[in-house]
Structure formats: structure tokens, C-alpha cells
Design a protein with these regions (language model features):
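Iron-sulfur (Fe-S) cluster-binding segments and ferredoxin-like electron-carrier domains
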Residues: 240, 246-273
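Extended hydrophobic/Leu-rich segments
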Residues: 1, 115, 278-282
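Local cysteine-cluster metal-coordination motifs and their immediate loop/turn environment
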Residues: 136, 140, 144, 232-253
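Short, intrinsically disordered, charge-biased short linear motifs at domain edges
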Residues: 220-223, 228-238
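Long, charge-rich boundary regions
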Residues: 268-284
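Generic structural signal of hydrophobic/aromatic residues within well-ordered alpha-helices
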Residues: 94, 252-256, 278
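ATP-dependent adenylation/nucleotidyltransferase module used to activate substrates
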Residues: 2-225, 248
């Protein structure tokens, strides 16, 4: 450990690069957000100084894990997979993302619509896909691994939480994903700094970005059309992403707005949707 502790001076700016850090460990889920962070980490620190970690928590399918591994392999980044299913075996009906859950993944509505409908019913706008404290668990696991992999050199834990994940009602402190909020990120960074004597930093480069801005940031960091389509965001399995669950809807809309999808064929080729649905996504 450091003989003299120098704590992070970024304060609330956890979406900016921490100073003096040359190593990074990334949370990789196989989706677009974490892939963007992985490309950014490799461009910033070099593949040899980056590690990717994926969680198997008993999700409905393992396609996203295969996508996460492929991303790491293509960038020549070390890939680690953790099985944390025992932690989530106590009540699998609490999240629609768990295999065997009685909750169903909502279709044909984006997250903003779902949140506003919940609020109208007087319900807390927490997503049915929220997994209890997963991000906190993930971040702390990455911190523990990073301390070993990087042999107690200062490093960053990078996660892909972004502003569209928060979805708070104005004036409320409850959002769709409570562990994706700036408040959570700032507090977690401080806790990591204290618990590691200043060795581990939380870096959330997408924290204040919308999904469309995430896609644009991915392009800036070298992601191509093919790279985006290798990622898997869909909550359902199959040979193609469904194009109808909330994460598919938000993803496709972002890729269209960012100019990555420019024709209906781009959508039809990669999602299980009709030509009519693809045209709606393209605004036709």
C-alpha cells in the first residue's frame, strides 16, 4: 500500500480521467455501453494495461457473456468471468432479468415511458429489470481483482453507467436504476479510495451522457459499425436481438440518432423486427 495516501481530487467529477493512473479494470456485460468503455480504456491505457470482467448472475441467457468475451479477445484484453449466482438465489422473482423469474420483460415501450407509467400509478419508478445492488457488488469485486492483477499500482474501475439509466422524476431522489446515479458513483468512489488507501478510483466516463452520446463516444474511440453490432444488449436470447424490449428500443434509437444505423436494412439485419418496425425506427 502507499506509504502516504493521496486521495482522489476529482470530487464529484468521476466522469473525468483520474490523474496518475495507468491501469484499468472494466465491467463488461457484452452490451454497447460497456463495449464503449472498453474501447475507451484500451485507447487511453493500452490493451496490456486493461482487464475486462463479466458477471454471470443467473441471467436469462449467456449470449451477452459470449459477446463480452469476444470484445475482450478482439482487443487483446484479459477476460475474467465471475459466477455470483449464489448471491441472487434467494428471490429470483425480484428482477425480470433472472432466468425463471415470474416477472416478464416489458415489450414495445422505452424506459422513459415505463417510468412515467409507474409514477402515474403512484409506484416507485424502479425498473423491473433492476438487479438488487448489482453495480455496487460488481464495482467492489472489480476493485478486489484490480488490487491483485495490478499488484497494488493505482488503477481505475470503469463502468458504463450513463444518464439515461437514472431516469428520475424531477424533484425525486428515486430513479429507474438507483445504482447508476451520480450520487451513487461519487459516494462509491470515495469509499473505494478509503478502503484501498487511494489505490482504486471509480471512473464513469459515460455518467452524464445520453444513450445517443454514448454511441457517439464509442465512434470517437474507434468503434465501427461491426463493433456495435457484435455487442448484445437484448434481454431475450435467440439468434437476433428482439428489437422490442426497452433496452433494444433505446439502443436502436441511439444508433439511428448517432448516424450508425442509416437504413432500415441496418436494423432488419441485426434485430428480429419487421420492415414496418424498422421504418418507424428510421422515422419513415
Amino acid at each position: 500500500m502507499n506509504a502516504e495516501v493521496k486521495y482522489d481530487t476529482r470530487d464529484s467529477k468521476v466522469d473525468t480521467l483520474p490523474e496518475g493512473v495507468k491501469y484499468a479494470i472494466c465491467a463488461v456485460s457484452g452490451g454497447m455501453d460497456s463495449a464503449t468503455c472498453l474501447f475507451h480504456a484500451v485507447r487511453t491505457y493500452g490493451a496490456e494495461n486493461v482487464c475486462g470482467v463479466a458477471l454471470y448472475y443467473g441471467q436469462r441467457h449467456d449470449i451477452e457473456l459470449a459477446a463480452a468475451k469476444e470484445e475482450c479477445d478482439s482487443l487483446k484484453v484479459r477476460y475474467i468471468e465471475l459466477d455470483v449466482t449464489p448471491i441472487f438465489d434467494f428471490n429470483r422473482d425480484i428482477s425480470a432479468l433472472f432466468a425463471g423469474s415470474k416477472k416478464e420483460v416489458v415489450q414495445d415501450k422505452d424506459y422513459a415511458t415505463i417510468m412515467h407509467e409507474k409514477i402515474a400509478k403512484g409506484e416507485a419508478p424502479i425498473s423491473d429489470e433492476y438487479i438488487p445492488n448489482r453495480n455496487s457488488l460488481f464495482i467492489n469485486a472489480l476493485c478486489a481483482i484490480g488490487l491483485q492483477v495490478f499488484e497494488e499500482k493505482p488503477f481505475a474501475v470503469i463502468t458504463g453507467i450513463h444518464s439515461d439509466d437514472v431516469l428520475k422524476q424531477e424533484g425525486s431522489n428515486v430513479g429507474a436504476y438507483p445504482d447508476c446515479s451520480p450520487e451513487f458513483a461519487i459516494a462509491t468512489n470515495k469509499a473505494l479510495q478509503i478502503s484501498t488507501s487511494g489505490l482504486c478510483y471509480l471512473y464513469t466516463p459515460l455518467l452524464h451522457k445520453t444513450k445517443t452520446q454514448v454511441a457517439e463516444f464509442g465512434k470517437e474511440n474507434g468503434m465501427t459499425y461491426a463493433d456495435f453490432n457484435k455487442t448484445w444488449s437484448c434481454y431475450k436470447g435467440g439468434t437476433k436481438q428482439c428489437g422490442r424490449c426497452p433496452t433494444c428500443i433505446d439502443r436502436i434509437n441511439a444508433l439511428v440518432k448517432a448516424g450508425i444505423y442509416v437504413t432500415t436494412i441496418d436494423i432488419i439485419d441485426n434485430y428480429d423486427v419487421t420492415a414496418e418496425t424498422a421504418m418507424k425506427y428510421m422515422g419513415k
